[in-house]
């Protein structure tokens, strides 16, 4: 009797394991085929020459590639590192699952009330359009095609709030280099100390070497190091007009200023306030 009972238990256990394996197979197979990993991607990113990011409220961001470089709203040169991050994000982001059916409408409304509309262009041809948004805690990102349902998206292997890339204002896409020009075209640099004018100096090409005007024995190596340091100056971030109360600082005037002139006599000026 005991032996028969053990046999029945083993049979039931075997059947249970087979049923469980079958259910797991069905579940895995369904999840792997129901989500199109390429849904929000373009066939060839190298053909994309314009990216438009439209918030529901506020200034849109237009990133446009022309004459060998990316521009922001046709006003500033774009930060090349940010452009790389944008395209890496577009390339690697994939849908993980549809938002649960019970909350699809509310999530879709949330995206279209607080998110961004993304448009990718090849020349003047719109090749991809979708919406990007996130939850209030900024822990999940949603992508949604214009006539589709929202998806929870991911970059496999990372826990990121992907929507943050698309939530940046136009000023954050601006190139951070202060003196953004070809330094092979350098002509001169003038440093002006407004409260200590005796400290003023000018660096310029003098025949075949760089020197300080009025100082023939200047150390050329130190001058080159100084110019290298100036060429590498970057902004941490740009301040939007009206963001900070700077009236008193502006009225006091800059502590010093640096003006660089290139061989085409274009001037690049940096004023430093302390």
Describe the role of every protein-language-model region:
Residues 1-274:
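Secondary-structure "cap/kink" motif recognition
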């Amino acid at each position: 009797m005991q032996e028969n009972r053990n046999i029945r238990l083993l049979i039931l256990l075997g059947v249970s394991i087979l049923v469980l394996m079958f259910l797991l197979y069905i579940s895995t197979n369904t999840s792997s085929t129901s989500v199109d990993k390429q849904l929000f991607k373009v066939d060839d990113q190298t053909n994309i020459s314009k990216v438009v990011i439209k918030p529901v409220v506020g200034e849109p961001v237009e990133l446009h590639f022309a004459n060998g470089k990316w521009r922001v709203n046709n006003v500033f040169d774009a930060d090349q590192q940010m452009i790389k991050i944008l395209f890496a994000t577009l390339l690697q982001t994939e849908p993980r699952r549809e938002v649960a059916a019970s909350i699809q409408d509310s999530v879709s409304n949330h995206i279209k009330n607080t998110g961004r509309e993304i448009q990718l262009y090849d020349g003047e041809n719109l090749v991809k359009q979708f919406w990007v948004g996130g939850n209030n805690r900024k822990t999940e990102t949603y992508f949604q095609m214009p006539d589709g349902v929202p998806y929870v998206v991911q970059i496999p292997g990372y826990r990121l709030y992907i929507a943050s890339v698309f939530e940046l204002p136009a000023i954050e896409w601006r190139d951070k280099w202060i003196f953004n020009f070809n330094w092979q075209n350098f002509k001169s640099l003038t440093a002006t100390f407004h409260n200590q004018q005796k400290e003023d100096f000018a660096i310029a090409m003098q025949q075949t070497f760089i020197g300080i005007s009025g100082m023939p024995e200047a150390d050329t190596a130190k001058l080159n190091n100084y110019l290298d340091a100036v060429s590498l100056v970057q902004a941490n971030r740009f301040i939007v007009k009206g963001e900070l109360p700077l009236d008193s600082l502006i009225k006091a005037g800059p502590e010093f200023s640096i003006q660089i002139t290139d061989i085409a006599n274009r001037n690049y000026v940096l004023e430093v306030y302390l």
